[in-house]
C-alpha cells in the first residue's frame, strides 16, 4: 500500500509542478498548436496554445512507478518485473512517436507532422518488439507476460497455439500490432476538446487499476478461495495504472477549458499504447472495448462518417469525431466534455460489473 501511495504522489506532484514549467518553456520556444482549418470555427482561438504536454504525463508515470519500485526494492528486495517494463515500454515508445509528430508540426508551423507511413512503420516496429518480448521473457511468477491468444477475461477464447509455437508468435504479433494501432488512434481521436482525453483516460485507467489489483489479490498460487488468475505481476500493473490516472488528473488541472496546454500526440499515443499494453498483459483485450468504450465510440463515429460519405457523398454526423457533432448541435465545449466523461464512467462501471460477474461465475459462487 505504501508503494502505491508513493507512486501516486510522485506522479501527481510531477504533473502539477512540471506542467507549468513546460508551459513556460514551450512559450519561450514558440511551440504552439496549429488548429485544423476544417474544424469548428470556435477552435481557432486555440491557435498557438502550448503543446507537447504529453511529455510531462509520460515522465510522471515512469518516475512514479520508479519511485514505487525503488521503495519496494529497498524494503522487500523486489526487483522490477517484465510486465511493468513492457507496459512502460509500450507507453514510452508510442509517446516517442507522438513527440516526433508533434515536434514536426510545431517546427513546420502546420498541422501535419509525421507521414502516415512513417507513423505506421514506427508503430509496427515498437508493437512487434513488445509482442515478441511479452511471449518469450522469463518471469519470476512463472506466468508469461502475455498469452498467445484473444481473451475477453483471463482465459483465451481463441488460442494461437493450434499450429505450433512459431505460428502462434506470428499471429500474436499481428494481433498486438492491431491492438496498438487501434488504441493509440482511438485515444488520439478523443483529444479534440479541452480536457476530454485527459479526463476520459483518467477514468479508464482507474478501471484498469481496479482490475489489476483484483487480479493481484486473486493470483493463482496465492489466493485461498475463488477463481484465480494466471497473470504476470498484476501489482506492478495496478501501480502503473494508478500513476497514469493521477498523471492525467494533474495534467487536467492545466488542460481543462480553456486549456493552458495540450497533451498533443505525445500524450494521446502514449496513453493509448499503455491502455493497449494493460489489456494484453491482464488478458482482457475484449473487455477493454467496454472499459475504453468512449474511445471506441469516437473511433466508430469517424469510421462511419468516412465510409458513409465515400458511399453516398452524404454525412451521418455534422462533423466527426462525434464530440464535434455535439458542438455543432449547440452544446458548449465544457458540456460535451463533462457529459462524455460521464459516458466513459458508465462504460467503466459496466466493464467492472462484467469483470466481477465473470469472477463470481468462475468461482462457482452463483450457486451459494
UniProtKB/Swiss-Prot annotation:
Any GO molecular function: phospho-N-acetylmuramoyl-pentapeptide-transferase activity
Residue spans crossing the bilayer: 2-22, 51-71, 80-100, 116-136, 166-186, 193-213, 234-254, 256-276, 277-297, 340-360
Taxonomy, superkingdom: Bacteria
Keywords: Cell cycle, Cell division, Cell membrane, Cell shape, Cell wall biogenesis/degradation, Magnesium, Membrane, Metal-binding, Peptidoglycan synthesis, Transferase, Transmembrane, Transmembrane helix
GO cellular component: plasma membrane
UniProt membrane topology term: Multi-pass membrane protein
Reaction equations catalysed: UDP-N-acetyl-alpha-D-muramoyl-L-alanyl-gamma-D-glutamyl-meso-2,6-diaminopimeloyl-D-alanyl-D-alanine + di-trans,octa-cis-undecaprenyl phosphate = di-trans,octa-cis-undecaprenyl diphospho-N-acetyl-alpha-D-muramoyl-L-alanyl-D-glutamyl-meso-2,6-diaminopimeloyl-D-alanyl-D-alanine + UMP
CDD domains xref list: GT_MraY
Keyword ATP-binding: no
Family matches, as Pfam families: Glycos_transf_4
Subcellular compartments: Cell membrane
HAMAP family, sorted: MraY
Entry function: Catalyzes the initial step of the lipid cycle reactions in the biosynthesis of the cell wall peptidoglycan: transfers peptidoglycan precursor phospho-MurNAc-pentapeptide from UDP-MurNAc-pentapeptide onto the lipid carrier undecaprenyl phosphate, yielding undecaprenyl-pyrophosphoryl-MurNAc-pentapeptide, known as lipid I.
Family: Belongs to the glycosyltransferase 4 family. MraY subfamily.
Name of this protein: Phospho-N-acetylmuramoyl-pentapeptide-transferase
Origin species: Bifidobacterium animalis subsp. lactis (strain AD011)
